[in-house]
Swiss-Prot record:
Similarity-based family: Belongs to the methyltransferase superfamily. L-isoaspartyl/D-aspartyl protein methyltransferase family.
List of catalytic residues: 69
SUPFAM superfamilies: S-adenosyl-L-methionine-dependent methyltransferases
InterPro entries xrefs: PCMT, SAM-dependent_MTases_sf
Subcellular location: Cytoplasm
Role according to the record: Catalyzes the methyl esterification of L-isoaspartyl residues in peptides and proteins that result from spontaneous decomposition of normal L-aspartyl and L-asparaginyl residues. It plays a role in the repair and/or degradation of damaged proteins.
BP GO annotations: methylation; protein modification process; protein repair
Protein name: Protein-L-isoaspartate O-methyltransferase
Keyword hit for NAD: no
Length: 220
């Protein structure tokens, strides 16, 4: 995906370049990920009233008690997910507004994304189609169950926090695959990476983060 935007203010190349430099200074090293952040128009994924903050490195509300993750978190999770090589098939839990989905799309052949809140999924679908990302498969469902019909996945990214990792997601991770998600309660969460080797799962905890909680059921 290469979306060229021009102009001044919130959508200018200079504004987006400043964000990329902040992410680089904050430790994001993969230039492919930085390019994806630069080329993904974040202002399209938030309310117009907040558009002046679109390229700040901060989380923003998107309604229904949910947020669009700060760009550093999106970049970091993407960087971790592709560190072992390009995954062919990826599952995302928590489509939200679709921003993380759009950043992920260039790095895999097949992308499946589950969202439990119907209005958010509908908006994400429109935005992704607007960006030419028709290949992304979206599903309105409880993310705790993953997407059994399309499993296994080479990589799984969850954009919501739980105190543990759902067994349903681990079982859908392919041998040699990687899962990235925040783990913890309301007060403390850490970005966690799980690598599968046969029936063994090796995990490592990395950065402190703050995500909305993993919730069950669906909302229409």
């Amino acid at each position: 995906m290469d979306i060229q935007l021009s102009g001044i203010g919130m959508t200018s190349a200079r504004t987006r370049d400043r964000l990329v430099q902040r992410l680089r200074d904050a430790g994001i090293q993969d230039e492919r990920v930085l390019d994806a952040i630069r080329n993904t128009p974040r202002h399209l994924f938030i309310e117009e009233a907040l558009a002046h903050q679109a390229y700040d490195d901060t989380a923003l509300p998107i309604g229904h008690g949910q947020t669009i993750s700060q760009p550093w978190v999106v970049a970091r999770m993407t960087e971790l997910l592709i560190a072992k090589g390009k995954p062919r098939k990826v599952l995302e839990i928590g489509t939200g507004c679709g921003y993380q989905t759009a950043v992920l799309a260039p790095f895999c052949d097949e992308l499946y994304s589950v969202e439990r809140i119907r209005p958010l999924q509908d908006l994400a679908r429109k935005r992704l189609l607007q960006l030419g990302l028709a290949k992304v498969q979206l599903k309105h469902a409880d993310g705790g169950f993953g997407w059994t019909a399309e499993a296994p996945f080479d990589a799984i990214l969850a954009a919501c926090a739980r105190v543990d990792i759902p067994e349903g997601l681990l079982s859908q991770l392919a041998d040699g695959g990687r899962l990235v998600m925040p783990v913890g309660g309301d007060r403390q969460q850490v970005l966690t990476v799980v690598d599968r080797d046969g029936d063994q799962f090796r995990s490592q905890t990395l950065d402190s983060v703050r995500f909305v909680p993993f919730q069950r059921g669906v909302l229409r």
